[in-house]
């Protein structure tokens, strides 16, 4: 599971380049191929020239920023492969946009590059702003701190933690928190979340479910299972 981010343009030594140093930057909104949790993942662009030192700097930049934001005690995964490398790390589920931008900055900085001043495609940015990788490292880290504080939703985290303590599923996207499943679920807009004591916990619970994964045949399999259950 993941959600793509718009990619900033690249600038190196004052020159605008035609490509970015990565080909995919994602928010990981749940369990994924790296770890069982939320976070961010970045894949280097095919053919990008980098060495072991750049890879170490990339990870070190991520660790530095995570420590600054208090995310130190979480997983970081680095994978090298034939065409490049990927780096993924766990992050608070309510701060995944800043996590993705942090990962992008960490790679830019590791390569000695900067993003252009093209505004980030962020509906919440008021006014539109450049990517943090447009600035020097100290300013980038300062901006990441501010962005994390703006994105954080402590009341959302508290509700999800309360649901987990009670063994009730809770799922949040960019707009809504739902607690429970199926007919035994209730949803709230993120800008109108209830107090923990106002949630009707006794009415909310999980339901039996089947998960279908794979690259081909998922829809057909789900339709087949649904038909079998209806006929049962």
Where are these regions (language model features)?
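A short, surface-exposed helix-loop junction/capping segment
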Residues: 135-150
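Metal- or metallocofactor-binding catalytic centers and their adjacent structured scaffolds
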Residues: 125-128
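N-terminal donor/sugar-recognition subdomains of glycan-related enzymes
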Residues: 151-152, 191
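N-terminal accessory interaction module
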Residues: 45-123, 144-147
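Short Lys/Arg-enriched alpha/beta "domain-start" segment
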Residues: 1-71
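Charged, amphipathic alpha-helical linker segments immediately N-terminal to NTP-binding catalytic cores
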Residues: 152-185
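Long, low-complexity repeat tracts used as extracellular stalks/passenger repeats
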Residues: 87, 132-134
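Phosphate-binding loop of NTP-binding sites
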Residues: 177-183, 190, 194-232
């Amino acid at each position: 599971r993941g959600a793509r981010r718009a990619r900033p343009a690249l600038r190196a030594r004052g020159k605008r380049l035609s490509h970015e140093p990565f080909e995919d930057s994602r928010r990981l909104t749940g369990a994924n191929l790296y770890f069982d949790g939320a976070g961010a993942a970045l894949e280097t662009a095919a053919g990008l020239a980098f060495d072991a030192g750049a890879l170490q700097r990339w990870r070190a930049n991520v660790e530095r920023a995570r420590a600054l934001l208090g995310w130190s005690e979480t997983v970081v995964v680095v994978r090298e492969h034939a065409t490049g490398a990927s780096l993924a790390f766990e992050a608070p589920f309510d701060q995944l946009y800043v996590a993705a931008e942090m990962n992008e900055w960490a790679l830019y900085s590791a390569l000695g590059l900067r993003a252009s001043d093209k505004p980030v495609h962020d509906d919440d940015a008021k006014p539109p702003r450049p990517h943090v990788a447009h600035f020097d490292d100290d300013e980038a880290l300062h901006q990441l701190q501010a962005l994390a504080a703006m994105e954080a939703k402590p009341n959302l985290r508290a509700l999800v933690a309360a649901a987990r303590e009670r063994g009730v599923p809770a799922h949040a996207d960019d707009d809504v928190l739902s607690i429970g499943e199926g007919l035994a679920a209730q949803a709230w807009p993120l800008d109108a979340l209830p107090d923990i004591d106002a949630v009707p916990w006794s009415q909310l619970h999980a339901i039996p479910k089947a998960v279908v994964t794979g690259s081909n045949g998922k829809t057909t399999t789900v339709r087949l299972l649904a038909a079998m259950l209806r006929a049962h």
